[in-house]
């Protein structure tokens, strides 16, 4: 587990609600709840108690684990070219002693070497289509704009995303994406509140002929996610996506369910929020600030 201070989230709900939505819709992500931390009997604060993504996590959630876990390494670069061995080794979070990234290199090379229908066949072979589409559905509904769908300019014509892991199945040619770090989710649902994270396009749209462009209050450069070889290959499945999206709204992402969850969870942490505000002053939201941000979650989903 890890304890996340949630300094960027004045509602203190983004991680718990976001991971709940992913997990409840069949996407393998960490469990998360709230924790009140005391050190030597003294109250330290309210934290998100979020399951850490590491070897024990993959052992627990992937049929015994054993496969490579990579943090923030995308199989091809933003120009669609394959990655080098050192790149994948640098992202390894399990099996570092062996550092056998040959399967990731093979996947990367196949993505590099193929286009159109052949590319789609490669992606479908290596990534479970239903799970990836479900991941897209939840990611876009909760506006996880600081995650794998946001390709920020790294330098020149190269763009990188972050806040995710890949799990490589040891006995199959398969990879599964695991979203991570959801504290900025939910912010841009109604309007672009965060000056850094907003994504211009819908997940299946492209802008500026797949070249970088400036967007948002800070005018930062980004690149459309659908220009990526993996994400772009799913744009042919928009009807499947829409079907899953409707199911997600019917089952989970609706005001009745969300309000019920927030009512229950906010009652659990109200006193802790107030106590933290008294303890840390301006470094923590006041009870009134917290209530205002909770109200935004009540009214945001659409």
Predicted regions and their residues:
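Short, acidic/polar N-cap/turn motifs at the starts of alpha helices
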Residues: 32-34, 163
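Middle-to-C-terminal accessory/interaction subdomains
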Residues: 101-150, 154-163, 171-301
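Zn2+-dependent metallopeptidase catalytic core
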Residues: 13-27
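Internal "kinase-insert"/substrate-recognition segments embedded within catalytic cores
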Residues: 5-6, 24-30, 42-147, 176, ...
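Conserved NTP-binding catalytic cores of kinases and kinase-like/nucleotidyltransferase enzymes
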Residues: 1-17
């Amino acid at each position: 587990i890890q304890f996340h201070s949630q300094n960027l989230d004045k509602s203190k709900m983004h991680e718990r609600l976001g991971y709940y939505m992913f997990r409840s819709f069949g996407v393998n992500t960490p469990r998360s709840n709230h924790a009140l931390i005391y050190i030597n009997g003294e109250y330290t604060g309210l934290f998100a108690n979020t399951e850490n993504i590491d070897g024990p996590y993959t052992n627990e959630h992937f049929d015994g684990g054993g496969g490579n876990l990579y943090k923030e390494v995308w199989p091809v670069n933003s120009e669609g070219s394959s990655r080098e061995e050192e790149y994948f080794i640098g992202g390894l979070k399990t099996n570092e002693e062996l550092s056998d990234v040959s399967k990731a290199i093979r996947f990367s090379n196949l993505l590099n070497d193929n286009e159109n229908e052949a590319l789609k066949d490669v992606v479908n072979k290596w990534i479970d289509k239903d799970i990836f589409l479900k991941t897209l559905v939840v990611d876009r509904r909760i506006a996880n704009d600081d995650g794998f769908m946001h390709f920020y300019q790294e330098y020149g014509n190269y763009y990188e995303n972050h806040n995710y892991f890949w799990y490589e199945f040891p006995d199959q040619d398969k990879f599964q994406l695991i979203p991570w770090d959801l504290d900025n989710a939910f912010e841009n649902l109604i309007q672009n509140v965060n000056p850094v994270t907003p994504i211009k396009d819908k997940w299946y749209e492209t802008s500026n002929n797949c070249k970088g462009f400036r967007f948002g209050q800070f005018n930062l450069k980004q690149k459309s996610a659908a220009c990526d070889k993996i994400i772009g290959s799913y744009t042919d499945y928009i009807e499947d996506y829409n079907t899953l999206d409707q199911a997600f709204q019917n089952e989970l992402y609706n005001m009745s369910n969300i309000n019920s969850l927030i009512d229950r969870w906010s009652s659990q942490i109200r006193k802790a929020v107030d106590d933290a505000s008294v303890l840390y002053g301006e470094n923590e939201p006041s009870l009134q600030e917290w209530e205002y941000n909770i109200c935004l979650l009540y009214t945001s989903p659409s």
